[in-house]
Amino acid sequence: MHDKYLIADDWGYILGGRNTDNRFLGYYKESYNEDRDLLVYGEKPGQGSSFQALEAYFHEIWNQPCCKEFDAKGGIGGLEQCCERVKERYPEAFDRIYSKEDWEKATMETRGIELWTNPTEPENKEPVVWERMIAAMEGEEDILVQTPYMICSRKMYEDLRSVCEKGARVDIVINAVESGTNPFGCIDYLNQKKKICQTGVHIY
């Protein structure tokens, strides 16, 4: 699985594309890759529809026959020791407990959040997410898509062309090739950039 999310009790969750290693987290190098993370929380703990959907998704993955527990050395004791070392090194990160007002100032209210996923079985999958994306684009004038990489099938090219021909402006934001960490995604974009642009989308 390539999912990256952190559920905090029944309060909220962080969802993003950032890998949990030193290339993406912390300040261990002079420069490191930045990625987008979303903090989502609700007024009523555990009641938001997207929060409930993410929890259900976690249990769906966790309970699949192909999954098994990882036998980590050290157990919870090693994790607690690591936490203490972090507190010693970065005490300022633990000095302040944020209030409800702090969170409200730092965030914005949404009209709703939906989490979509393809089938989770470890086998060839139907492109459920793509079909939902195309359906959501119907009748819209301005469409913004953010994705790390863009590798299209023949049908995806056809779908994008169809959306643009109906008058929609489609802007797609991808990772910079110069700093991308997925060589296959970067190379495919460079090879197919002209073909992508010929569908009518604007890519950045």
Regions found by a protein language model. Give the residues of each.
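Charged, low-complexity intrinsically disordered terminal segments
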Residues: 1-204
